[in-house]
Amino acid sequence: MVILAALCLSPLLSYGSSATSGYSEGNDSQTDGNVRLIVTTDLGGSDPDDIQSMIHLLVCSDRIDIEGLISSEAWVDDPDKTEKLRQTVEHFIEVLPTLRIHSSGYPSAEYLQSIVAQGQDKPHMDGVGEGKDSPGSDLIVDAIREDDGRPLWVAAWGGMNTVAQALHKLKSTEAEEVFRKYISRLRIYDILGQDDAGAYIAKNYPELVYIRNKEVYGWAPNDQWTKENIQNKLPLGAHYPNRIWATEGDSPSFLYVYSNGLNDPEHPEYGGWGGRFSKDRIRNIRGMDFIERSGKSETVFDDYYMIGSAPEGNQSIKRWEQSIYNDFAARMIWTQEKYYDKANHHPVAAYNGDRGRKPVYLYANPGDTVILSASGSYDPDNDDLEYFWSLYEEPSDYEGNVIFDDARGRDCQIIVPERVGDDGIHIILEVTDKGSPKLTSYRRIIIKNIK
C-alpha cells in the first residue's frame, strides 16, 4: 500500500498570538506557534552567562512570546539586581528598529520595558510565604490567570522561589477547582536546580510539568567564534560579555521553546535545540551543590519527581549545534544591517504544502510505502535550498530498518518497518538555504501504526 504525504497535524492546542502580548504579526515572522515564556534570572551575579543568554534570547524574541523577565535570587542573598536586567534590555532596545526590518514579529520597546520585574528579595524558600509577594511573583500570577489558550513556560536561570511564591498566592486565594485549572497551564524548565524551591514545587504540585536539565554544557561555541560572530556585531555585541566559566549555560531553556518546526515543547521526549528528556518522571533529581553549601537541603522534600535528561545527555543539544550557531550569527547581523536584501533569512520548511510548525502525524501499516514531500518550501531571499530527511533514532520506537530512497531530495519515500511502537517513527526534515550563514528550518513527521 502506498501512503501519500497526507497531513494530520498535532491534535494538541492550537497556539496563536495573544492580542495583548505586545507582539506584532506578519507573514515574514511566522508568529503562529510561538510559545509563552517567562524567565527568572540572577543576571548581574558573579557569572556573566545570564547576560549572554539574555542577549541571545532577546534577538530570538520574534519566535518566542516573552511575557516576563524577572530578576531573582539563587542560593545567595544578593542585593537587588533588577537594574542590571533593565540595562541589558535597554541595550537590546537600541537595535530593535533594525531587527524589525528583518522580522515583524519582534515585541515593542515599551512592551519589553513593561515586563521587567523584581522577584523575591530573599533566596530559597525563606523568600516564600504570606506577605512575601513581589512584583515578579505578581507578574507570574497574572500570566497564569490569563485565559490565553496556550501553556505558560517558566525558564529558571536562577532560583525558583518567585515561582513558588506565585503558586503560594494562587493556592491561598483561589478555590481548589480554579487553582487546579490554573496550574494545569504552567510548565517549568529549570536549569541545574539553583535553590531548594524547585524541589518544594515538585513535591507540593506533582501534576506540574517540571523539567530539570543537568546537561546544559558542552554545546556552546568557542571564544573565537563568539568574538567574530557575536561580540564584533556592534552595538549590541559590545554588551555580550566574555565567559568566566561556561558560555550560555541557561540558553537551552529558551531554545527548547524556540519555534522552528523541530520540537514540540508539550513532548519533552521528542527532543530539539533545548535538549531531549525522559518520558517518565525521575525521583529526587538533585540541584547544584551550592544549595547545601548555603545551608539548605532538598532532601526535606523527598520524594519529589521531575522530568530529567534523556540518556544521551548533552548530545541531544550538540547534534543541532551548528544550526544554533548560524541562527544566532544571522540574528546579530540583523542588528546591524538596515537593508533586508543584504542579510540572510530563514527558509520556510513545508510538508506537502503545509507551512506550519507543528508536528505532522501520519498513520500507516508495516510494509506500506510512505511518500514524503517538502513541496511548498521556499526561501524569502530566493536562495537555493538543500533538503535532508533523517530518522531521529532516540525518540523513535520500531524494529527493522528505515531507509530513505533519496534522503537529500525534495521528495522521498520510505517503507514502514515490521514493527512500529506507540512512540512512532520520528522523521526530521531539514530545509537549509545557501545564504550566509546557512539557516535551517525544520518539520517533524511522526509515523504511527493504523490502529
Please state what every model-predicted region is.
Residues 2-14:
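Bacterial N-terminal signal peptides
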